[in-house]
């Protein structure tokens, strides 16, 4: 084998090892981001919702700071109800449709998938209706979310 071929083979192997160490994004959260984009017609990137208020993003505590944060709390509570039913909301893939009037769940026969899709669609529509206050992005949750 030629030395150049060995270098290419080595580079491919190293690349594959690096890719294998990247944790996968739960499929449902990817779908949820698409639903948000569908509901708000692409007017705000989904990362704006990952660290907003007391409930948008990982975890949550205290009193929601505004209407948008209440949408996130309701979504968190909905996922909590899904877990009580034995569902895995962050891993449940489902079929949805993005129409002129926003996202809809479609052709879902399994109870968990339907429940989680409904949680996500309602949250995405709530996000689209709620005003976005830049002052509530990346807040100090230790002070404001008691």
UniProtKB/Swiss-Prot annotation:
GO terms for cellular component: extracellular region. It catalyses: a 1,2-diacyl-sn-glycero-3-phosphocholine + H2O = a 1-acyl-sn-glycero-3-phosphocholine + a fatty acid + H(+). Binds 1 Ca(2+) ion. It is an enzyme of class 3 (hydrolase). GO terms for biological process: arachidonate secretion; lipid catabolic process; phospholipid metabolic process. Residues 1-19 form the signal peptide. Expressed by the venom gland. GO terms for molecular function: calcium ion binding; calcium-dependent phospholipase A2 activity; phospholipid binding; toxin activity. Its EC number is 3.1.1.4. Belongs to the phospholipase A2 family. Group I subfamily. D49 sub-subfamily. Disulfide bonds join 38-98, 54-145, 56-72, 71-126, 78-119, 87-112, 105-117. PROSITE patterns: PA2_ASP, PA2_HIS. Its cofactor is Ca(2+). It is found in: Secreted. Snake venom phospholipase A2 (PLA2) that inhibits collagen-induced platelet aggregation. PLA2 catalyzes the calcium-dependent hydrolysis of the 2-acyl groups in 3-sn-phosphoglycerides. SMART domains: PA2c (SM00085). Residues 20-27 form a propeptide. Ca(2+) binds at residues 55, 57, 59, 76. This is Acidic phospholipase A2 S5-32M. The active site is at residues 75, 120. Keywords: Calcium, Disulfide bond, Hemostasis impairing toxin, Hydrolase, Lipid degradation, Lipid metabolism, Metal-binding, Platelet aggregation inhibiting toxin, Secreted, Signal, Toxin.
């Amino acid at each position: 084998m030629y030395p150049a071929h060995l270098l290419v083979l080595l580079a491919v192997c190293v690349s594959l090892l690096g890719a294998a160490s990247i944790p996968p994004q739960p499929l449902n959260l990817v779908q949820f981001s698409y639903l948000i984009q569908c509901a708000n017609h692409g007017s705000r990137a989904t990362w704006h919702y990952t660290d907003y208020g007391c409930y948008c993003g990982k975890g949550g505590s205290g009193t929601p700071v505004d209407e948008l944060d209440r949408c996130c709390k309701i979504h968190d509570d909905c996922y909590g109800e899904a877990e009580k039913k034995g569902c895995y909301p962050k891993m449940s893939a489902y079929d949805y449709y993005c129409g002129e009037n926003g996202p809809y769940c479609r052709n879902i026969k399994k109870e968990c998938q339907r429940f989680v899709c409904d949680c996500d669609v309602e949250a995405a529509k709530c996000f689209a209706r709620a005003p976005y206050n830049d002052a509530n992005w990346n807040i100090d949750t230790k002070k404001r979310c008691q």
